[in-house]
């Protein structure tokens, strides 16, 4: 009984990440025989830490990325705004990468669901791990447009094109 139920369930990847951020440094090319749409995703991370000693109240004395604010418990909390950058590689057919290229521009806010993969890159004679998020066409991964300055909420058009490309193949 369990095996028949198990066969009907779709096996999903264990390594799955969801990121929201601004995209920039867009590149289009080929990796082996697969078409690639690659960009850098910049995510803003807000980190709260308790302040051990009282901080000065003037906002000019603190760096621009650090502010103090009262916590609901009445404690002083220091907020750090950090920016993290991730490389995203969208792999698929040429029609898939062309659709992404036509609808996504620099500065767009996107949601990325994909698989985190680490590759080794040789830099100055040393091998260094290089993490990137892999978005494969039709593999429980997606790139969705959240906000664009030039195109007002055209995510439905992007998703329609991507699904039509998937059904053609």
Swiss-Prot record:
The protein's location, in the record's own words, is: Mitochondrion
Q: Which organism is it from?
A: Trypanosoma brucei brucei (strain 927/4 GUTat10.1)
The alphabetical list of record keywords is:
Mitochondrion, Transit peptide
The segments labelled Disordered in the record are 54-76
Gene3D superfamilies with a match to the protein in the record: Nucleic acid-binding proteins
Q: Which cysteines are joined by disulfide bonds?
A: none
User: PANTHER family from the entry?
Assistant: RNA-EDITING COMPLEX PROTEIN MP42, RNA-EDITING COMPLEX PROTEIN MP42-RELATED
Query: Which residue ranges have biased composition labelled Polar residues?
Result: 61-71
Q: Where is the transit peptide?
A: 1-91
Q: What CDD domains does the annotation carry?
A: KREPA5
Higher taxonomy:
Eukaryota, Discoba, Euglenozoa, Kinetoplastea, Metakinetoplastina
Q: What is this protein called?
A: Uncharacterized protein Tb927.8.680, mitochondrial
Q: Which GO terms describe its cellular component?
A: cytoplasm; mitochondrion
UniProt KW Zinc-finger keyword = no
């Amino acid at each position: 009984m369990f095996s028949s139920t198990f066969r009907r369930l779709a096996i999903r990847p264990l390594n799955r990440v969801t990121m929201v951020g601004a995209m920039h440094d867009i590149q289009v090319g080929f990796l082996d025989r697969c078409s690639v749409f690659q960009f850098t995703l910049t995510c803003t991370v807000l980190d709260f830490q308790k302040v051990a000693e009282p901080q000065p109240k003037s906002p000019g004395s603190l760096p621009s990325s650090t502010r103090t604010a009262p916590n609901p418990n009445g404690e002083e909390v220091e907020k750090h705004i950090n920016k993290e950058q991730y490389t995203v590689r969208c792999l698929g057919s040429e029609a898939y990468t062309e659709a992404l290229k036509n609808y996504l521009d620099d500065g767009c806010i996107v949601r990325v669901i994909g698989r985190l993969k680490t590759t080794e890159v040789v830099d100055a004679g040393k091998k260094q791990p290089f993490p990137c998020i892999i978005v494969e066409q039709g593999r429980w991964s997606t790139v969705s447009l959240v906000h664009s300055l030039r195109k007002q909420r055209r995510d439905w058009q992007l998703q329609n094109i991507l699904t039509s490309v998937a059904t053609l193949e």
